[in-house]
Swiss-Prot record:
UniProt KW keywords: DNA recombination, DNA-binding, Transposable element, Transposition
InterPro entries: Transp_IS110-like_N, Transpos_IS110, Transposase_20
One of the GO BP terms on file: DNA transposition
Protein name: Mini-circle putative transposase for IS117
Top-level lineage group: Bacteria
Span of the signal peptide: none
GO molecular function: DNA binding; transposase activity
Lineage: Bacteria, Bacillati, Actinomycetota, Actinomycetes, Kitasatosporales
Length: 414
């Protein structure tokens, strides 16, 4: 194996302003140590130090570091160098192998990381060699998902505030798709941030507000509905207190508008980038996967096909495969808690959407429920099956085939 021929290993203990570097040989002898700054000069100093100890394009020195992000990692990943992102908890266990005094220092941690590669490189996985487009999709998809979560967080704050003084607004918008994040809800609440102002809205003002929000039909029905709600009797705060709550609502609505705009803009950017990728057609052939959800899945699994040796590895990474804990007479099989949470989040949405889009997926889910699985367990089981099929399709460059994927279940249903 390629790691058998390596004789030099590098460990980096990273920080915000500087990084400690340690280089060891295959016997554990410290060849060099240094502290570099977190800038171009520091990165060049690191590359020069590696070159002094045999680093080249043909024989790059592998590097261990406790992060997979940042400009330092990007500089190290140029070329064919293997960069290993070591979990800090795992690194802490290695620190105790050579002493129990629990002493700790940044140069010492860099040495520990270098020795991890020297002794146990085969047990750790290098960062995947994803394409530039796949890395861009990862950035956009994660940013869009974060924007959606931020939007919901601010919407929850708006909802909590409205419960304090403005129940009519909740009655008017919360039951509709999108709830308080809807454009018409945000426009109307900006026009009338208090119950007193809402009760004074005229039909013309409501019509203008709905038009400004982008609504194009069913004006009269919606206008009458809103006016009826806003002029109904509800419990009220004192006038001065109500006005103060109104100012707070306007501040939150400005934040909500910004998060909604960010989520929409990022969704467009994600979809455009995703459709440029060669794997997009395969992902979109699966039931339940659209451009946005497909991009989230691709963002987490990447396009380095050597990353997962088999479907089981992908399932374990996603957290859909169960884990076994056995010791003596004890034997337990349960769900995984250490997993890629973003991939699992996208996977649950994928499995749920597939119930309506795929008869085979629906039959699989129903069979698991009949066997006693709860909803979440049945969805996780369905996702586990989908991931195995996705791994096969990506490796063989095939599109999803409903008849082949769920043939026994479809035959039984027929």
């Amino acid at each position: 194996m390629w790691e058998d021929s390596l004789t030099v290993f590098c460990g980096i203990d990273w920080a915000e302003r500087h990084h400690d570097v340690a280089i060891v040989d295959d016997t554990g002898t410290l060849l060099a140590k240094a502290r570099i700054t977190d800038d171009v000069a520091g990165y060049n100093k690191l590359l020069d130090l590696l070159a002094e100890h045999g680093d080249s394009s043909a024989t790059p020195i592998p590097v261990a570091i406790e992060t997979s992000h940042g400009l330092l990692v990007a500089a190290l990943r140029t070329g064919s160098r293997k960069v290993f992102a070591i979990n800090p908890l795992a690194a802490a266990r290695y620190r105790d192998r050579h002493g129990v005094s629990r002493k700790k220092s940044d140069p010492g941690d860099a040495l520990v990381l270098a020795n991890i590669l020297r002794t146990d490189m085969h047990a750790h996985r290098p960062l995947p060699a994803d394409s530039e487009l796949a890395q861009a999709i990862t950035v956009l998809a994660r940013a869009q998902q974060d924007a959606v979560w931020n939007r919901q967080q601010v919407a929850n704050q708006v909802r909590s505030l409205l419960r304090e003084y403005y129940p009519a607004a909740l009655h008017a918008f919360q039951s509709k798709d999108g709830g308080l994040t809807r454009p018409d809800a945000r426009v109307i609440l900006t026009m009338a941030p208090t119950p007193a102002k809402a009760a004074k809205l005229t039909l013309a003002q409501l019509r203008a507000g709905l038009k400004r929000s982008g609504r194009t039909r069913a004006f009269n029905t919606e206008i009458e509905r809103l006016r009826g709600i806003f002029r109904s009797e509800y419990a009220r705060q004192l006038p001065a207190v109500e006005d103060a709550f109104g100012h707070q609502l306007l501040a939150l609505l400005r934040q909500l508008d910004a998060t909604c705009l960010a989520a929409d803009d990022l969704a467009k950017a994600v979809e455009d980038a995703f459709r440029e990728h060669a794997d997009s057609e395969i992902l979109l052939s699966f039931p339940g996967l659209g451009p946005l959800l497909g991009a989230r899945v691709l963002a987490e699994i990447g396009d380095d096909r050597s990353r997962f040796t088999d479907a089981r590895a992908l399932k374990s990474y996603a957290g859909s495969a169960p884990i076994t804990r056995a010791s003596g007479r004890k034997h337990f099989v349960g769900r995984r808690f250490v997993k890629n949470n973003r991939l699992m989040n996208a996977g649950f949405l994928w499995a749920f959407a597939a119930l309506q889009a795929s008869p085979g997926a629906n039959a699989h889910y129903r069979r698991r429920r009949e066997h006693g699985d709860w909803h979440a367990a049945a969805q996780r089981h369905l996702l586990n099956r989908f991931l195995g099929q996705l791994h096969h399709c990506l490796q063989t460059r095939q599109h999803f085939d409903e008849q082949r994927a769920f043939a026994p279940l479809l035959q039984a249903a027929a």
